[in-house]
From Swiss-Prot:
It catalyses: S-ubiquitinyl-[E1 ubiquitin-activating enzyme]-L-cysteine + [E2 ubiquitin-conjugating enzyme]-L-cysteine = [E1 ubiquitin-activating enzyme]-L-cysteine + S-ubiquitinyl-[E2 ubiquitin-conjugating enzyme]-L-cysteine. This is Probable ubiquitin-conjugating enzyme E2 L460. It is an enzyme of class 2 (transferase). Transmembrane segments: none annotated. PANTHER family: UBIQUITIN-CONJUGATING ENZYME E2. One of its GO terms (biological process) is protein ubiquitination. Catalyzes the covalent attachment of ubiquitin to other proteins. Keywords: ATP-binding, Nucleotide-binding, Transferase, Ubl conjugation pathway.
Length: 158
């Protein structure tokens, strides 16, 4: 592990904490057991989305060669979303090897996930059944997502 990699991770974490008032209504980040490579994120479902005001916990695992490779990001809170599989893995271009570059950072990942909650991508789904429902019966899709959130998610209380 290169000390500049650790410094980059520490700088990102410090910046997020220093600016936390800017993000407090959208997400919260904490290291897990003071492990610089493992972060817990709580995201508030975006306004006017099917996930509005629900709290979603994610885990971010940074590798030894971050920022030269993307972190592993997954939902811990169960979620019904066409771009998230049942293990919590997220289908998002910037998390893929060919979509990642070292100029991206954790903040850009989090904002991209928040946007994905509001604007799912039916062209690149993990859950093709949900994507098909979204395209063919939006009312049933909306109900399915809302019902799942009510059952499996907690409201944002941060």
């Amino acid at each position: 592990m290169n000390s500049s990699n650790i410094r980059r991770i520490q700088n990102e974490y410090n910046k997020i904490n220093n600016d936390k008032n800017l993000y407090a209504d959208s997400f919260q980040i904490n290291m897990v057991d003071e492990n610089i490579f493992l972060w817990k994120v709580n995201i508030k479902g975006p306004e006017n989305s099917l996930y509005e005001n629900y709290n979603f916990e994610l885990e971010i695992e940074l590798s030894n060669d971050y920022p030269y490779s993307s972190p592993k990001v997954k939902f811990i809170t169960p979620i019904q979303h066409m771009n998230v599989n049942d293990k919590g893995d997220i289908c998002l271009n910037i998390l893929k090897k060919d979509g990642w570059n070292a100029s991206l950072n954790i903040i850009s990942i989090i904002w991209s996930i928040i946007v994905l909650l509001d604007q799912p991508n039916p062209e690149d789904p993990f859950n093709s059944e949900l994507a098909s429902l979204y395209r063919n019966d939006k009312l049933s899709y909306d109900k399915k997502i809302r019902d799942y959130c009510k059952t499996h998610s907690k409201l944002w209380t941060f």
